[in-house]
């Protein structure tokens, strides 16, 4: 084994950044000199302002390129009617959110900051605290949601009440700029991050593509497609792989080279990306309720690996694609330009709020009557819900289970009304509710049979596909699972939710049990009382096509 001469290879060699920025301020930066070199001095206030503005912008606006991809669905003759319906709701939602009152999604996310600090940038220390202060200011001052739970011991938790802590990862690099990527990462998309430990045997053209397609299928619709999907093959460690997945899904590595070299540079496999996008379109899942647009795009990145390891990572950025770059240089503080006018992407003929035909359901009547009406319609039927709905999510269900396990039974409200799996953002002044879109249904699957056996949770409303145990429970007890569109939380708050009040557990914040009154609240029948599951039917249809 001969020794090669030393050669340093930048692991992620990126081309020039062509991101469009706007100048936030030229204050809080100055130039100095040290040992003959010019130094950029950055005051702590600059970091706080940067973080505050970046997370504000990302909470209410998305990138123009993303909005264009959504708009393209409306003009695609191959898109299903459900694809187009969901895309239109996303654009309407963005149009409302861009006003800066109701955030794009009710899950305003964990604040993640990746910073690369040039060696000739001096701050005097305390960078993490200054950035965290900016995150704090955003979540306190805007109508966002506090989603972070702090453990008091291994089992007891309390909401931090500020959305802190933020995840802040800072790196030292060459140069005289301080560059950032800020991500507001919701729980739904974060939970669709996976690591698979494979071997060299996977690395053949015949095996790898089929493997990735099968993994992609497991994503389901719970994280609000259309997705930006990222696959990473290889990595010097498991954590390097998953870190690359996160950044790739945020388009941070789009300017990587498209071929490798003997020194181990990361690269994109553009051809495999195209092939996988076609496969995603053929899955049939579409933009949540069947169709073509399961994904907007796919990124596939290849990394070097240890000979004994072959990590494969998969992750997504969801329809709330909240990623934003920022930087500080000698001119001042710069923030990536997001789309301030998403309404321009809505075709003129679709600007009115009419939704076409939907079955109107009056929820202010006995549960037996509501169930009897739903039983008349097949899965995939679009509904317009009107009346009272109970709102509760993870901790609320855990509280209800405690009651059942203790022999206390269920409160009457969980028997009399449908339950919506959700947790509201803060309510702006003059509004009935803050942004209030659905959370992932699957996390509540284990509770359904026990609840329905006692007459509760007979109609469930949430987002995404569910497990077989829910289908079985609904068939056994005569229940239904209705799908709400994951993503357009601002549309629901402005157009459908007429009142919001806390029913129980106010100390739990967004995890409390709430009651809402709704008008024309859109939903689809996804699981019925006869054992039919909309998503299983799609899978069977696709399998039949494969056999043919």
From Swiss-Prot:
| InterPro entries noted in UniProt | Class-I_Fumarase/Tartrate_DH (IPR051208), Fe-S_hydro-lyase_TtdA-typ_cat (IPR004646), Fe-S_hydro-lyase_TtdB-typ_cat (IPR004647), Fe-S_hydroAse_TtdB_cat_sf (IPR036660), Fe_dep_fumarate_hydratase (IPR011167), Fumarate_lyase_CS (IPR020557)
Instruction: List, alphabetically, the Gene3D superfamilies matched.
Output: Fe-S hydro-lyase, tartrate dehydratase beta-type, catalytic domain (3.20.130.10)
Q: Which organism is it from?
A: Escherichia coli O157:H7
A single Pfam family it belongs to is: Fumerase_C
Record note on quaternary structure = Homodimer.
**Cofactors per UniProt?**
[4Fe-4S] cluster
What does the entry comment about cofactor binding? Binds 1 [4Fe-4S] cluster per subunit.
- Enumerate the catalysed reactions: (S)-malate = fumarate + H2O; oxaloacetate = enol-oxaloacetate
Q: Name the gene behind this protein.
A: fumA
Q: What is this protein called?
A: Fumarate hydratase class I, aerobic
Q: Family assignment? A: Belongs to the class-I fumarase family.
